């Protein structure tokens, strides 16, 4: 196992011990769409802040994004963070998006010795984060634009884990987030290259919840969304707030110094490049165009109603209270 993978497991163990506990009937079950890592540390902190304001939560991390979405759809969880568009139309209002947390600032990566253009990938295997994820949406769009068809589709959750697979020669084409793309290129830029991707990125990770839970817990929903909007605003001004909050709350106490030192750099890069960016109604409209082209939504943009997919009142309240 690589050092990066070992540290990822340590992160997961540290957050799991802090964020989980006995669940009561009033506890909001939260399903995270990927294993806990540095990338989700800000989300963990926002949940902790909401808990301090009386929102009882228990967070569970799933190995695959589609499992987290299904947990919310089925009622095993009430709240989720993932990309739920692929199943939202079929679920007919079971869940509603609350706030966009991250954007699809991702890059297609290929092994230079094997592929040089998108055309070279016609009929070839390609690895994504998970079924129905933003990475697969990007792949679908680029395949459509390039008039190619992928061969076998493989799925490895987490950009850091896909880096390990690339370095070990297990995969030769995938899509990585911005920070991990930079890490890969620093380590092995002579072996790998980026291909053209999509511009004007849509929402990636979205905070969403069951509609029936929203209706019964509107005060809690307001607090939850407000804490995410507030923290993202603080992060935009000072990315080091994530490390400050980690220390303040005693999260990840056993985290190696090497990783702690990289946390602020990770969020600094993410904020600078627009990865961590909240959104509501403005995000919804661009999301429709993107996920329609990706095949994860059906119909025409003009036919899709924002209110069928989003409950915007908490986000609008938070922005009015805190400022954009």
What are these regions (language model features)?
Residues 18-25:
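Sec/Tat signal peptide C-region and signal peptidase I cleavage site
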Residues 288-324:
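Conserved C-terminal helix/tail region of periplasmic/extracytoplasmic solute-binding proteins
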Residues 1-5:
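Positively charged n-region of N-terminal signal peptides that target proteins for export
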Residues 7-18:
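Bacterial N-terminal signal peptides
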Residues 217-300:
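Secondary-structure end/capping motifs
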Residues 26-156, 163-165, 172-178, 191-192, ...:
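Short, glycine-/small- and polar/acidic-enriched structural segments
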Residues 102-108, 203-207, 211-212, 287:
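Small-molecule pocket liners
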């Amino acid at each position: 196992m690589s050092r990066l993978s070992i540290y990822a497991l340590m992160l997961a163990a540290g957050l799991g011990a802090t964020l989980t506990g006995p669940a009561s009937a009033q506890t909001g079950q939260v399903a995270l769409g990927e294993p806990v890592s540095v990338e989700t540390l800000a989300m963990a902190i926002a949940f902790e802040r909401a808990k301090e304001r009386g929102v009882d939560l228990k967070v569970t991390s799933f190995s695959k994004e589609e499992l987290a979405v299904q947990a919310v759809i089925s009622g095993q969880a009430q709240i989720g963070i993932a990309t739920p568009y692929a199943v939202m139309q079929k679920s007919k209002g079971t869940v509603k998006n609350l706030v966009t947390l991250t954007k699809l600032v991702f890059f297609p990566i290929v092994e230079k010795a094997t592929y040089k253009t998108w055309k070279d990938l016609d009929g070839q295997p390609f690895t994504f984060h998970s079924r129905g994820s933003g990475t697969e949406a990007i792949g679908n769009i680029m395949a459509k634009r390039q008039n190619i068809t992928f061969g076998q589709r493989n799925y490895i959750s987490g950009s850091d884990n896909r880096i390990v697979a690339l370095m070990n020669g297990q995969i030769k084409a995938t899509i990585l987030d911005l920070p991990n793309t930079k890490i890969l290129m620093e380590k092995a830029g002579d072996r790998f290259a980026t291909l053209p991707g999509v511009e004007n990125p849509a929402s990636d990770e979205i905070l969403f919840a069951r509609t029936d839970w929203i209706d019964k817990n509107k005060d809690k929903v307001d607090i939850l969304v407000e804490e995410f909007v507030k923290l993202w605003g603080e992060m935009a001004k000072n990315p080091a707030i994530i490390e400050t909050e980690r220390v303040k709350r005693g999260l990840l106490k056993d985290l190696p110094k090497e990783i702690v030192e990289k946390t602020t750099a990770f969020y600094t890069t993410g904020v600078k490049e627009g990865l961590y960016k909240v959104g509501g109604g403005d995000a919804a409209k661009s999301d429709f165009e993107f996920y329609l082209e990706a095949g994860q939504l059906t119909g025409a943009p003009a036919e899709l109603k924002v209110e069928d997919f989003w409950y915007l009142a908490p986000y609008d309240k938070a922005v009015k209270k805190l400022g954009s």
